[in-house]
């Protein structure tokens, strides 16, 4: 893969506006596609200070300043109330939304389940899900499929198989649509986000999303209660994530998680977990279709039934996946709220200030990444990784609240990519308009129509 080739091809991204947007233009940009709202200076400055009708905010782009918020003084920067307001009705108070002692108890109890040894035990189940998708593609060779939808279906099937041993009764399409509907509706900026309206006033988005929320929360609750009853009765049960979570104990106290916490975390894993990995796979497959040199390298490494050792040898595939996560981070924004006054470097922060860390902006920052908008997987070669500042690359967050499922997601993505590349090559459909689109996660705005071709035929 030559530098000349890479520098003549800029993967699609919105062009930042020049200068600050006025209040109405900013609201429209945030509502239409949030990544279009950041002006060009955001990709060059260490921080941006701003205000809206709900108060002040600071966008951080300097790795040292980000470290201060996520590590050094993390206790002063919990997740902001607006984020919790949107997520809690769906995922309850699991790891994604819990705070303080509740979060610490959950984290130390759940984290051991996602250590490499635990994740490795799921690889065979993951491979079955990928094989079933590829068998369907065998019957559709030459056809055009929406790869974004295919990856969402795949990662949902993997979560269903590894978490619930495929015992979910609600049809996959119904569950998947419910999850997408909920997070899509609440990920859209509305007047409640920019005006000081009473918090008790019902949000139309919440009302629209409630039926979808009920579908997946009720289904998970049924499965959890059924499994808990079987365990209590001494029956043999699958060794999946439901069973492991019910049996997990706090390493400090020996106490189990409460039923409500187990339920909320299961909803979190199936709701938030599968969509982020689906987006990572979608964007990586798109980049492979655009950069055939990269596609050839992934195919050269590909293996049909990868185990943990085989995945560890996928050096080029991992580099390409990590570069895809840089260009198209599945979660484009994260935010915190200052509990009390603080200094972040030279920036004085008042209590209540919203701190925004935007991987979409950070990963394309001109001072941190040479050729920031270009696809250059060699950035992540073993000999180059040490040059990347630790807090310049945050596809899974960082600090105490780094994504607990990071290892699971990376192994899942590597396994899917190598199995797909061994058997198929994907080509973007003629005339397809590909543009990233941000709600809570980053997806292609119009899906990703691609033609499925058997690898041996090309």
Segments (PLM) and residue ranges:
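Conserved cytochrome P450 K-helix E-x-x-R motif and the immediately C-terminal K′/meander segment
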Residues: 23-45, 218, 307-345
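N-terminal membrane-proximal hinge/A-helix region immediately C-terminal to the signal-anchor transmembrane segment
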Residues: 2-105, 120, 124-135, 154, ...
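Cytochrome P450 catalytic-core helices
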Residues: 276-295, 299-301, 407-422
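Conserved cytochrome P450 K-helix/beta-meander segment immediately N-terminal to the heme-binding cysteine loop
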Residues: 357-384
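Cytochrome P450 proximal C-terminal region
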Residues: 3-13, 130-134, 149, 180, ...
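Cytochrome P450 heme-thiolate monooxygenase catalytic core
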Residues: 2-13, 78-84, 102, 118-279
């Amino acid at each position: 893969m030559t530098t000349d080739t890479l520098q003549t091809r800029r993967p699609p991204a919105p062009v930042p506006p020049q200068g600050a947007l006025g209040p109405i233009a900013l609201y429209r940009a945030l509502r239409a596609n949030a990544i279009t709202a950041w002006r060009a200076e955001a990709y060059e400055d260490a921080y941006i200070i701003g205000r809206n009708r709900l108060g002040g905010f600071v966008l951080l782009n300097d790795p040292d300043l980000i470290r201060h918020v996520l590590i050094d003084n993390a206790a002063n920067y919990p997740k902001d109330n607006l984020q919790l307001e949107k997520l809690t009705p769906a995922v309850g108070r699991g790891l994604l939304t819990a705070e303080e002692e509740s979060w610490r108890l959950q984290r130390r109890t759940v984290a051991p389940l996602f250590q490499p040894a635990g994740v490795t035990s799921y690889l065979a189940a993951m491979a079955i899900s990928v094989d079933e998708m590829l068998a369907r593609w065998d019957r559709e060779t030459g056809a055009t499929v929406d790869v974004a939808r295919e990856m969402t279906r795949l990662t949902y099937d993997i979560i269903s198989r590894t978490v619930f041993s495929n015992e979910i009764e609600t049809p996959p399409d119904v569950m998947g649509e419910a999850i997408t509907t909920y997070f899509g509706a609440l990920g859209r900026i509305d007047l409640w986000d920019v005006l000081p309206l009473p918090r008790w006033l019902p949000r139309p988005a919440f009302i629209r999303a409630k039926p979808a929320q009920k579908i997946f929360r009720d289904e998970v609750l049924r499965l959890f209660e059924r499994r808990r009853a079987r365990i209590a009765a001494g029956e043999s049960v699958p060794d999946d994530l439901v069973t492991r979570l019910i049996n997990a104990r706090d390493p400090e106290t020996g106490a189990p998680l409460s039923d409500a916490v187990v339920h909320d975390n299961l909803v979190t894993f199936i709701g938030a977990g599968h969509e982020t990995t689906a987006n990572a796979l979608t964007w990586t497959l798109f980049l492979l279709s655009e950069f055939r040199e990269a596609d050839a390298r992934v195919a050269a490494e590909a293996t049909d039934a990868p185990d943990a050792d085989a995945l560890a040898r996928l050096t080029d595939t991992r580099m390409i996946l990590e570069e895809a996560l840089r260009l198209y981070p599945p979660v484009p924004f994260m935010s915190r709220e200052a509990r009390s006054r603080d200094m972040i470097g030279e920036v004085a922060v008042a209590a209540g200030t919203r701190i925004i860390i935007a991987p979409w902006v950070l990963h394309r920052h001109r001072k941190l990444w040479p050729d920031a908008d270009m696809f250059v997987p060699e950035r992540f070669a073993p000999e180059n990784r040490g040059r990347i500042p630790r807090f310049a690359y945050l596809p899974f967050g960082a600090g105490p609240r780094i994504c607990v499922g990071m290892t699971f997601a990376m192994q899942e993505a590597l396994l899917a990519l190598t199995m797909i590349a061994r058997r198929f090559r994907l080509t973007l459909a003629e005339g397809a308009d590909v543009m990233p689109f941000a709600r809570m996660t980053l997806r292609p705005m119009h899906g990703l129509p691609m033609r499925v071709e058997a690898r041996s035929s090309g």
